A protein has these predicted regions:
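C-terminal beta-strand-loop-alpha-helix "lid" module of Rossmann-like NAD(P)-dependent dehydrogenases
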Residues: 1-243
Length: 243
């Protein structure tokens, strides 16, 4: 059977592929992935197990390296528009780590896009692959049927399973990119709404200050006019008295 399907008897080193964005200004998108990955790493450390983080995105790269976590090669520069070649490069790298025995399990940590208003951080096993059992009507596994393979089934597995790993990584990258755009759209809308509210408040304050200034000037003019009028009356009275 393929090495992709064989679970290791003991998980000594776990590998986490943390998919974040290359840029910020997207609300809590990056922090959710970083917290989830860091939580798994700390749990491994408490269990006396080793770990390795594969950062995807500059935010993950900067976060884990700045805090001196064990990291491997990082993959950056494509978070907003990933291509299949990007997933292929990541897949080949982590599969090579697994086949060489440097890690015993590989997991994806990314943000799953549910809808434009809902995204969730998920952790999905990548290698070894999990087998799905199709249940029959009697509660037992359904019959697989008789199939003829050309070429040999082992050769087909060895060819298709790495492609399957790449496809799953690509799906995770697409989910992450859609989630990043949704988070950024909400963050920018919130910033715009806050800016408009701030403009209204500042305009109200400015108008009030301008009104107070105009009122003060009018009061000064009226007071000055009244003072001048009072002086003129005094002059007339003195002139009449002298006559």
């Amino acid at each position: 059977s393929s090495a992709f399907l064989k679970a290791r008897p003991e998980i000594r080193t776990a590998c986490y592929v943390a998919i974040t964005a290359d840029r910020g200004l997207c609300g809590g998108y990056n922090s959710g992935i970083l917290r989830a990955t860091e939580g798994e790493v700390k749990a491994d450390v408490l269990a006396s197990k080793d770990y390795l983080v594969v950062p995807v995105g500059r935010k993950a790269e900067n976060y884990f390296r700045f805090r001196s976590y064990k990291t491997s090669r990082s993959f950056t520069g494509f978070s907003d528009a990933p291509k299949y070649e990007d997933a292929k490069a990541i897949g080949q790298f982590v599969v090579d780590l697994y086949l060489r025995g440097e890690v015993d399990r590989v997991e994806l940590v990314y943000t799953r896009f549910v809808s434009s208003g809902r995204q969730e951080v998920v952790r999905r096993p990548l290698v070894p692959l999990e087998r799905d059992v199709i249940a029959g009507g009697d509660g037992k596994s359904a019959s697989g049927g008789n199939y003829e393979f050309e070429p040999d089934p082992e050769l087909i597995l060895q060819t298709l399973l790495p492609r399957y790993v790449e496809a799953r990584i690509y799906a995770a990258l697409l989910n992450a990119a859609a989630s990043e755009h949704a988070f950024r759209q909400r963050a920018m809308k919130s910033a715009t709404d806050n800016a408009e509210e701030l403009i209204k408040n500042l305009s109200r304050i400015m108008n009030r200050a301008r009104q107070d200034s105009i009122t003060t000037e009018i009061m000064e003019i009226v007071s000055g006019a009244e003072a001048l009028g009072s002086d003129d009356k005094d002059d007339v009275v003195r002139e009449m008295a002298s006559n």
